[in-house]
Amino acid sequence: MVQSLKLKKILVTGSSSRFCKYLKEDLKHYNVFFTSKKNFNILDFKKMEKFLKNKKIDYLIHIAGLSRPMSIHEKNIGLSIDLNIIGTANIVKACNNKNIKIIFFSSNYVYPGKKGNYSET
């Protein structure tokens, strides 16, 4: 399986994230494109879909989003909704349209830091 992935084109969103710093090292022997919001804006659906088509992406690892949405959410709810909800929905829709497999990453920062009625799996 790992050998067959070396033949696939993989796109990773959120390349400036702390997590991607480590992922870049782990995936250096694969055909991976690390994108940033400059060249792959998850809020611009048409450009994003064109990029995916032109690069002929097989897999998309979605990491882009706000790393601490709860603190930013209070200051700018629009930005939080745009990046973490609308942007992710755009990724899912574009990948679905192009038959691209998605791997989605998130962190514990999606929780407000208070004990609540939720669990992690």
Where in this protein do the model-derived segments appear?
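Conserved Rossmann-fold NAD(P)-dependent oxidoreductase catalytic core, especially the SDR/UDP-sugar
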Residues: N90-T121
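NAD(P)H-binding glycine-rich loop region in Rossmannoid oxidoreductase-like domains
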Residues: F45-L83
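Adenosine-cofactor binding site in Rossmann-like domains, unifying the SAM/SAH pocket
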Residues: N31-F51
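Short, well-ordered alpha-helices that flank and scaffold nucleotide-derived cofactor binding pockets
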Residues: K21, E25-H29, K53, A89, ...
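N-terminal Rossmann NAD(P)H-binding glycine-rich loop of SDR-like oxidoreductase domains
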Residues: V2-H29
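Rossmann-fold scaffold of SDR-type NAD(P)-dependent oxidoreductases
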Residues: T13, D58-I63, F104-F105
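Glycine/Thr-rich phosphate-binding loops of Rossmann-like dinucleotide-binding domains
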Residues: C20, I42, M70-S71, P112-G113
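Short alpha-helix in the Rossmann-fold core of NAD(P)-dependent oxidoreductases
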Residues: I81-T88, I103
